[in-house]
């Protein structure tokens, strides 16, 4: 799950760069972890179900290489169900994070989008078709 760990780290680093509190960093770790997990499950599903033309890379490589994936561990239906659970948990975590974000108190700070960019990334990661 190297890609998932990288995604989690990137989300947390964004918070660190913005001077996030420990509470916010914990929330960002959770969001990043779920985002990374969702991305990985979706990647495994796409590798098993999509064709190479749609993916833009060779489909079925994980199975051909004997890799352990969410699809090999849970089956297609199980991996889809797990992705649905992760996506719902991610949505809830993003909503809670956005609700806790006040608007910036001064004009020197960029406008606060209450995590909209992160939410958009989450949707792309777990609902993508390639």
For each predicted feature, which ranges?
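All-alpha prenyltransferase/terpene-synthase fold signal
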Residues: 1-130
């Amino acid at each position: 799950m190297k890609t998932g760990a990288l995604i989690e780290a990137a989300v947390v680093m964004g918070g660190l760069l913005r001077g996030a509190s420990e509470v916010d960093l914990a929330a960002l770790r959770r969001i990043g972890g779920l985002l990374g997990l969702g991305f990985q499950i979706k990647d495994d599903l796409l590798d098993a179900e999509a064709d190479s033309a749609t993916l833009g890379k060779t489909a079925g490589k994980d199975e051909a290489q004997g890799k352990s994936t969410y699809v090999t561990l849970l089956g297609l239906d199980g991996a889809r169900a797990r992705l649905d659970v992760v996506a719902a948990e991610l949505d809830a975590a993003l909503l809670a994070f956005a609700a806790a974000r006040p608007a910036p108190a001064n004009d020197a700070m960029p406008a606060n989008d209450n995590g909209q960019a992160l939410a958009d990334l989450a949707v792309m990661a777990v609902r993508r078709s390639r």
